[in-house]
Amino acid sequence: MDRSAGLPVRLLLLLLLLLLWSVAPQALRPGSHSLRYLFMGASKPDLGLPFFEALGYVDDQLFVSYNHESRRAEPRAPWILGQTSSQLWLQLSQSLKGWDYMFIVDFWTIMGNYNHSKVTKLRVVPESHILQVILGCEVHEDNSTSGFWKYGYDGQDHLEFCPKTLNWSAAEPRAWATKMEWEEHRIRARQSRDYLQRDCPQQLKQVLELQRGVLGQQVPTLVKVTRHWASTGTSLRCQALNFFPQNITMRWLKDSQPLDAKDVNPENVLPNGDGTYQGWLTLAVAPGEETRFSCQVEHPGLDQPLTATWEPSRSQDMIIGIISGITICAIFFVGILILVLRKRKVSGGTMGDYVLTECE
């Protein structure tokens, strides 16, 4: 089968999985870290999807992937490429293989409870359906933890696990059959709770230690402020580049005083792909007042806050000078052209009043 034919379906599946992810807790508290796994799969290969595929994220940065066909964990972050022989990686690979098996069993259970399979004389033939799972944990600055485990079926919320009660919350009536079946097996519920409250936080701490050992204590190597023009007006953008860990605070100052939060767009922080991060903060300003504003950055790797301001570059001054010169020259030549045309008009009128006499 042509794999390219399943690409649109794969993109749709990823979109559905992101929708499922969006309802999981993602706004990390300052000093917190997270470990998340996204599982997805299709019941039939005609969708161009594997039976099981897994993506692992630490602090929202992809670091491992796995699929049912290869049955191998693949490193997806530069800082973990050389660690595939470590004990942590071997444990991670074994966990993903176990989840592969459990995912397929759960998939068949859910489809059976939905009557989404056809029974023939020879075998049970499943219909085409999609299962998504998100699970993981967070370790907060005070060393407390929280976990989550959710199932989505055909793009809709299905079940969510509650570690405190060991129960499953059904998102729709047809999920009750699976809920009751899973809650009868208390061993599974206790194992799920132990993973979220013990194993997952331990693994997260190990991954973070490995990441820090490879990257070291990165700090913003460059903080700069740039000016931008648009149809909506003038804005300043503050950029902090190549820092680690992810936690960073960026704020705008006007005349050395912090601006009200309601006047500032929220900061954006994204991974670079090499284990470090970049962040930026924008602010709309009135033309001519750019120099009154400065950007202040705080980061664990800095001894004190770092402040940067916008400064016009020489190239910008040169461009402005050239544009001004061209404008003045254009006005000058237009003025000369108008004078010439006016003189020609006057001369043309005089010539029009003069009549040549006929030759005798």
UniProtKB/Swiss-Prot annotation:
Disulfide bridge partners, by residue number: C137-C200, C238-C295
User: What protein am I looking at?
Assistant: Hereditary hemochromatosis protein homolog
Superkingdom classification of source: Eukaryota
Assembly and partners are described as:
Binds TFR through the extracellular domain in a pH-dependent manner.
Membrane topology of the entry: Single-pass type I membrane protein
One of the GO BP terms on file: positive regulation of receptor-mediated endocytosis
Segments on the Cytoplasmic face: 341-360
- The residues on the Extracellular side of the membrane are 26-319
What SMART domains does this protein map onto? Answer: IGc1 (SM00407)
Query: Where in this protein does the record put region Connecting peptide?
Result: 311-319
Glycosylated residues, per the record, are N115, N143, N167, N247
Q: What does this protein do?
A: Binds to transferrin receptor (TFR) and reduces its affinity for iron-loaded transferrin.
Record key words, sorted = Cell membrane, Disulfide bond, Glycoprotein, Ion transport, Iron, Iron transport, Membrane, Signal, Transmembrane, Transmembrane helix, Transport
In residue numbers, the region (Alpha-1) covers 26-127
Residue ranges of every copy of the Ig-like C1-type domain listed in the record: 220-309
Membrane-spanning residues: 320-340
Q: Which PANTHER family match?
A: HEREDITARY HEMOCHROMATOSIS PROTEIN, MHC CLASS I-RELATED
